[in-house]
Design a protein with these regions (language model features):
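Short, well-ordered turn and helix-capping elements at secondary-structure junctions
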Residues: 25, 74, 103-108, 125
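Soluble catalytic domains of enzymes that build or remodel membrane lipids, polysaccharides, and related
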Residues: 109-215
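Short, mixed-charge, low-aromatic patches
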Residues: 2-5, 59-62, 90-99, 122-130, ...
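Short, flexible coil/linker segments at or flanking structured domains
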Residues: 12, 16, 58, 85-92, ...
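Non-catalytic terminal accessory segments
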Residues: 1-95
Length: 215
């Protein structure tokens, strides 16, 4: 983890190495936090009880009562939940594509829009991809919806237009829609999370290339 952070360079952007390092850090810290909190609360209780026994002159083998095994087991159980979830998210979860269907009703909706279907996708973050087969499955899933219109609501990359280059041919397999495809830029598409070392021309060129990806 330390090596990963030492190697982090904002001028390079979010590489697979930096994302992996971030995942390891969360994997290390979040479960540890869930272990520490209940144990720390129990320690406050033990300290209070120890002080109470001391003030009351109650004879005890030790000043602090022994830690209860049940509390330790509960803490470990709590820590196992995010640990398992993070492992799943880092390996399988990012490709767990799902279709969520939502029927929208409007009293004043023209009859011509009855049954009109819009498919909306978002936050592709192509720089995080490493499995072509899974992405092709996602494209097939989009095409299977038989929608009338497609909306893409931003973040096609993490920062750099080049992140999308290996996936352009795959995304071109998205079929045409009767009422077209529409998109807006996301916050990551502006390249603001990258250190451009003051090179405004490179930043502007990258932004133009990202806009062309949307074309």
């Amino acid at each position: 983890i330390v090596y990963g952070f030492l190697q982090f360079d904002r001028s390079v952007g979010q590489t697979k190495q930096t994302l992996f390092t971030l995942g390891l850090m969360l994997l290390f810290l979040i479960p540890k936090f869930l272990i520490v909190v209940p144990l720390l609360l129990e320690d406050f209780y033990r300290l209070g009880k120890g002080i109470f026994n001391y003030v009351q002159h109650k004879p005890t083998p030790t000043f602090l009562p022994e830690r209860r095994r049940f509390i330790s087991q509960v803490a470990l159980g709590l820590a196992a939940i995010p640990f398992g979830s993070l492992i799943y998210g880092m390996t399988k979860g990012k490709y767990n594509f799902k279709v969520i269907k939502q029927t929208v009703f409007f009293d004043d909706l023209p009859e011509a829009f009855n049954g009109f279907k819009i498919i909306q996708i978002s936050d592709v973050h192509s720089g995080s991809f490493d499995n072509k087969e899974k992405i092709e499955y996602a494209i097939d899933l989009i095409n299977q919806q038989e929608a009338d219109m497609m909306l893409f609501t931003g973040d096609i990359v993490n920062s750099l237009a080049s992140e999308m280059h290996p996936w352009i041919d795959t995304f071109r397999k998205i079929k045409s829609f009767s009422y077209g495809k529409y998109a807006v830029l996301g916050n990551h598409d502006y390249g603001e999370y990258l250190d451009w070392k003051g090179n405004k021309n490179a930043k502007a060129q990258n932004f133009e290339e990202i806009k062309q990806l949307y074309g």
